[in-house]
Swiss-Prot record:
Positions bound to S-adenosyl-L-methionine: W125, G150, A151, G152, D171, W198, S212
Listed name of the protein: Protein-lysine N-methyltransferase efm3
Entry similarity comment: Belongs to the class I-like SAM-binding methyltransferase superfamily. EEF2KMT family.
InterPro entries named in the record: Methyltransf_16, SAM-dependent_MTases_sf
PANTHER family registered for this protein in UniProt: HEPATOCELLULAR CARCINOMA-ASSOCIATED ANTIGEN, PROTEIN-LYSINE N-METHYLTRANSFERASE EEF2KMT
Keyword S-adenosyl-L-methionine included in the entry's annotation: yes
Lineage of source species: Eukaryota, Fungi, Dikarya, Ascomycota, Taphrinomycotina
Keywords attached to this entry: Cytoplasm, Methyltransferase, S-adenosyl-L-methionine, Transferase
EC number annotated for this UniProt entry: 2.1.1.-
Catalytic EC class: transferase
Amino acid sequence: MHGAPEFLTKVKQQYLQQVDLYRFQWVSKPTDWPILFNDYAQVFLSEIVTPSAYTRAFLKSYFRFLDSIDSGHNERNEALLYTYIESLSSTYIPPVQYSLGEYDILIRESRHVLLREGTTGARTWEAGMALAEYIYQHPVQSGMRVLELGAGTGLVSILCAKMGSIVLATDGDTKVCDGVRENARLNNCDINVKKLLWGVDPPEFSDIVFASDVTYDCDLRCLATTLTQIITINPNCKIILSASLRRQETFFNFLKLIQNLYARQLEVWDSPKILYYDSPPIVFYEVSK
């Protein structure tokens, strides 16, 4: 529906991103509540929802709010009710959609899985979302050679590919690489995906490198070796790192390991978040020769 109120557009974005209902932002201001439950809003929602386990929880929450404020004068939209009934038995898990301006990126992931088969790459982490926002606000150039380390679900790589860059997405886990390939196909993106073990496999020539949440205790020295190799191959390469400061000591230990390179913290922009996530403080660093 065209001309929808801004808060309904945000509801749609959160629904497609499958934001947890306990932190779902239904309205932007108190005066939006009556609009959220009128006939227009119900038709708007009926056009975006599809039967799934997430939709079941989403509509259950919506109907609960509706029952709490409605005195029974408004009829429930039949299409919404039908979708809810279908969702009761649905086991379908749709891809998550991350919307960054004109770029809609579909990602198949396990949003509530922290670790699967020894890897954290089964879901998109907050630092990865923040890095995607950073790239959207500081676009890569068409034709630029982009390397992503620890690609995870591939959100950052796919965004860069949609911007016209030549992308190599890498990860140290074979199954994670398979997941990136699947997500690239889902978005009709031509992305080269390769398994890369830090400190072991030689990296390829790149104009710019992106990595999010890659500073772990056991991998710090190997990561530092790979970053040094990248700069050696192309001294003009820039490396952009994002990290959630869950353990600041670990990140600062990493910075000590790359003292042979130039690392500077990037200033946090004042723009509001585009995607929906909660996170510890996230820092950005640019590493260069």
